[in-house]
């Protein structure tokens, strides 16, 4: 989008200059509210169209997908195009990455994990733990990188201690800080 601004030079001459204008999220929302009977539907459809342009095959509202996409963008990784396999790869496609996220004050959860499917950890080179702001759950405040071998060792310890009915293991922020390195802040 372009607009015109008036500028005054040193001789008090007024000139108009064409400039590129980028609106922020609040301005975009105000515009959409003015021009749509159903702003929510338009916003979701727009994000879905953007997702499709990027080549993603999975449903926009698949749990975890938007944060995985966001983390991959922040770290310069290639986000998976389907829900199968690792969450992302490096630019060359030679390393697989898994992303875990939580809000500040929570713990990073690895769901549906047990002795029989440790390949979900082993297929990865690294894990990235993304911490989101407690008040604004869309704002990623910090990301740590942890080698998959370290995550696997901890997962085996946790699995050995957990009840048969539980298939979720958690990693505390303290564990991540101790075992990882900050790659985004």
Question: Model-predicted segments: where are they?
Answer:
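Nucleic-acid endonuclease domains
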Residues: 2-185
